[in-house]
Amino acid sequence: MNSLKPMLLTSLKSYNRSQFIKDVTAGIIVAIIALPLSIALALASGVGPEAGIFTAIVAGFVISALGGSSVQIAGPTAAFATIVAGIVAKDGMDGLVIATILAGIFLVLMGLCHFGSLIKFIPFTITTGFTSGIAVTIVIGQLKDFFGLTYPDGVKPIETTEKFRAVVENFSTINIDALIVGAVSLAVLIIAPYIFKRIPGSLIAVIIGILMVQFLPLKVSTIGNLYTISNSLPSFHLPAVSFEVVQNALPNAFTIAVLAAIESLLSCVVADGMINGKHRSDMELVAQGAGNIASALFGGIPATGAIARTAANIKNGGRTPIAGIVHSITLVIVLVVLMPYAGMIPMPTIAAILFIVAYNMCQWRTFVKLVKTAPKSDIIVLFASFILTVLFDLVVAIEIGMVLACLLFIKRMSEETHVNSWTYVDDDTPDVDEHLQKLPLQIRVYEISGPLFFGAASTIEHIVVKDFTTCLVLRMRSVPALDSTAMNALVDLVEVCESKGITVVFSHVNEQPMKVMEKAGFTKLVGKENFQPNISAALKRAEEVIAE
């Protein structure tokens, strides 16, 4: 049960004052980094700015306290922005709350059922494809604010394609003042990390953006122009629940759960490499579930482990969950004291921050490398996941991407299964290699290589017997697995052979195929004496058969 033990309990056993100081310092620095990001991601998700802070506070605290990683920092992430925006637009905040709670329940169940290790079975091409697709949707969604565009009344695009069309159709309404603020903010975000190692570039960009709007004659929309800002602490809210609402929320909940699991465990793996540690994936999933449930009930949005914030925590000395807890407490203080000033942040600055977030998450170098080096089947899955994410949504991308990946994998595996006949030789055959074994004319040997499953069962049809054949030997030393479809094909082969008076002998059947054969009663059908441990014994048995 150690896999379901919070890392906080383990960390406290050897905790000391020196590490506490490092954790507090790291927690405060990460909170400063998380502040502008949480606000920007909340706005990109179609909710109020305080919802992002609530998420970082509530989910961040719960996930740090219960998590299976000693350094994970959780909060709102860019991966959820387009999903959340779509849910809010269609189902409202109550729909989002229900979907997030259900996702939290799914995550808890995944952890309790020890599904943590199963996440690795999601292909890398799918995660790369939809991550790059999300980055593109974020950029397209922020073009309006970056250029200060004005849309006609009633035009509120939801889908990415609709947003792009609206940008193109209304580009003539560009606000040069907004473009100047956005361009300066973007330049600061790019240059600041090279100059200021400790101060996050997003915070510097926010301060400069506020100063530009407040002290220069620039007509630019700010958060305060579009949203009501509150510095009140998160309060408990339980939405009205009905069977129909829950049923409608299930697909979105599943997507949120899968994405939260993937991103949080990926963050844990990256963190393990940085601190030479090992996380508890099952406990991390339980914590992610509890954190998302708590976040939804206290006015937040979906949360998961954030790689950038986790890396910042590690680089600043954080080594235990105390750093994550301090990060949440610091954000509570910031919420109460500084939140009213958030209304002064220009929208183009928010857009610029999200452009950088999108760039950092798009993995374009990995994308290009896969296109150049990956097999064609993987490239198909990569582009399918990418395009479907941009044109539709993440639900469609993951579902179709997984189905496509499975089908292409089945095709690839079926191509690795071969049935080859041994070369028949006798004393009258000229130029015979010495290593070839001479066999009587009545014995025919086939060697099967690769997994025998439904995608490769048809290869058994390649086994051909002659009129003079009295014994067929099937060498299966290279068959690691057998399923019911292939088992049925073998039964058909044996029955056809028996009808022709041909005995079938099996050589070197591995453990898994043998279990399937025994369970299906196949060993009784063939006869246990016709299952031999190696080819020499099988050929000896074949000679006994033709001698009878």
Identify what each model region corresponds to.
Residues 525-541:
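Short acidic-hydrophobic, aromatic-tinged amphipathic segments that line or gate anion-handling sites
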Residues 290, 331, 515, 534-535:
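Short secondary-structure boundary/hinge segments and terminal tails
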Residues 84, 164-167, 460, 464, ...:
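Generic hydrophobic alpha-helical segments
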Residues 231, 450, 534:
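Active-site donor-binding loop signature of nucleotide-sugar glycosyltransferases
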Residues 1-424, 468, 489, 521-522:
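Transmembrane helical cores of multi-pass ion-transport proteins
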Residues 73, 506, 531:
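Conserved SAM-binding loop
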